Amino acid sequence: MQKDSGPLMPLHYFGFGYAALVATGGIIGYAKAGSVPSLAAGLFFGGLAGLGAYQLSQDPRNVWVFLATSGTLAGIMGMRFYNSGKFMPAGLIAGASLLMVAKVGISLLSSPHP
């Protein structure tokens, strides 16, 4: 007989999609321009975002890795977008990061505290 471990939390699909977008951006930057720093940063931040999304799917209050990752990327890529004026890739990642910060922040503020 299998023991019931309670309800499972749903996967954080938006978070995993965001992590895939960030990692894919790094891979594309490497493929198009041969930029090793772009590859390293994309895989690093994509991995952190994936870890944060996994943590969110396990406990919706465990937002700190995901929030720090998306907030850092919003700041870095927002400055790159401001300085270059190019939407791809800096504007896209900055916008997606801001949306993720807003989504997680709103869900954190609106959830009941134990």
Curated annotation (Swiss-Prot):
Transmembrane ranges, per UniProt, are: 8-28, 33-53, 63-83, 89-109
Membrane topology qualifier: Multi-pass membrane protein
Q: Which InterPro entries does the record associate with it?
A: TMEM14, TMEM14_sf
Recorded GO molecular functions are: transmembrane transporter activity
The alphabetical list of record keywords is:
Heme biosynthesis, Membrane, Mitochondrion, Transmembrane, Transmembrane helix
Q: Where in the cell is it found?
A: Mitochondrion membrane
Name the source's superkingdom: Eukaryota
Q: Which Gene3D superfamilies match?
A: Transmembrane protein 14-like
Determine if Thylakoid is one of this entry's keywords.
no
Q: Name one Pfam family in it.
A: Tmemb_14
**Biological process according to GO:** erythrocyte differentiation; heme biosynthetic process; mitochondrial transport; regulation of heme biosynthetic process
Q: What biological function has been recorded for the protein in this entry?
A: Required for normal heme biosynthesis.
Which family is annotated? Belongs to the TMEM14 family.
Question: What's the protein called, per UniProt?
Answer: Transmembrane protein 14C
Give the species this sequence originates from: Mus musculus (Mouse)
**Gene name of the encoded protein:** Tmem14c
